[in-house]
Amino acid sequence: MNTNRDAMAARCPKAKPLGGFYLPDHRLTFRGVADFRYDSDMVLPVVLWEITHDCLRALDRLEGYPTLYDRRKINGDWLIYDMNGNKGALGTPSSGYYDMIEQGYKDFGLDDWYLRAAAKDAELAA
């Protein structure tokens, strides 16, 4: 997930954070790395960034586009990376990856309950 301010500054120095928000009807999941699925009872904490074309290319490389993740437009012009294929089984994230997302949630005032719940779901499924 591209929630962490420092990580985004390193990979996309010209990206401008527009803030954190909650995407309705979606749930954070982990398949080793972050993904999401439809869930009418949940929200997905995300960070909206204004990015350049160079930043998009850098994010595409990072996200394994178009092999691992595909791009999906939501709310008009907003872009989100969505894992391809049948998405496979849930899997726990590495502690470093989890910590990076957690710091991003803190950076933007997002509730980390959703992060902890997704990690717990992945742990129980393993």
Where are these regions (language model features)?
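Glycine-aromatic micro-motifs
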Residues: 1-126
